[in-house]
Amino acid sequence: MIDFKLAELRKKHNLTQQELGEVLNVSYQTISKWENGTTSPDLSMLPHISAFFGVTVDALLGLAPLEDTYRPSGSGTAEYWEYRLEYLLHTRKTMWNRDYMQFLVRDVWNIREPITVLDCGCGYGALGLLMMPLLPKGSKYVGIDFSRNMIEAAKKYYRYSDINAEFIFSDIQSYRPKETYHLVICQAVLRHVNDGENLLRKMADFVKEGGLLVSMECNREFEADGLYISGMNYMDLCRHQGLRKLWQKELEQQNRDYSIAMKIPHYMKAAGLKNISSRMNDRVTVLEPEASDYEDFLDSIIKANHWDDEKTDREIETNISYFMNHGMDRKEAEDYCRQMNGIVKYLKNNRENISLTHTYGIMISYGWK
């Protein structure tokens, strides 16, 4: 698909259609027709037009980004998370089996005495709500997050619980704790930040001698293969070559690592931790229409993945521009947008009869100080 960028370039250079027509020796009506797609310029004119604007022909045709300047992902910023409470609520609903967390606490980490827990990047405190009732009585939970809205939400969720909890509004990177903790933990944090290894080392500093550091992270490759929808082609759902380029671009440009889950055990060793190991979260969501909680879980899966509505042409072009800026070529970006819209359409048309399997592929890595 060609996305002719003439109008965008003309407006960026503060030119009227009349002025651009005079430069190119055509009428303003011709410029208007080119911009609205009624007609197209002769191929021989493309080098002249692109040279005038100082861009490549591929960029003029929308086959390459107009700007070389990389636009960083904002997922490691407080602003990004201020209004994503609903997203966290929906994703956490299908993230854990309670009995597996109980197995980790009692049989793997062998926690038998009351402990203090620091949850780094706690969000609304989902991990504490799951874990704290499984810990010995007298344990304390401390959650820290750089989103004020998330901290306020956490306080509301814990207000009427029996959990001894405290919440701190602060950036982990600049946090200076008054004490160290028996257990320092994070969930789905390191994949979102720049330089996750550095943040992990920072977390290790918060751990008491003899204490435990735990990181729970999705490996994005696992996650990209972790969805099957009956009636859709599984191989098509797994196709993500363009995403691999995006992951590589973000790693090169801002040191955001979508594969960090695989590397964390080795980062823990470099940070001086001992008896390091890793496990896989055993949660796999299998959804069938007959399930009593079918609508609830389907709704959460749809909203967690932003599959509520098909994207408009304008939204698709905005997304394509972003994806191309992050390493995809235009075809890969178009294919990915088409894939997402295809999922939305299928789920909407078959809402009453969806069968699916979904897993995040979360790796749980841990080591003692």
Give the positions of each predicted feature:
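A short, Lys/Arg-rich alpha-helix, primarily the initiator
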Residues: 1-12
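Conserved catalytic/acceptor-binding region of the Class I
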Residues: 219-307
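Class I SAM-dependent methyltransferase SAM/SAH-binding core
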Residues: 118-120, 124-174
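Conserved class I S-adenosyl-L-methionine
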Residues: 66-115, 126-130, 134, 150
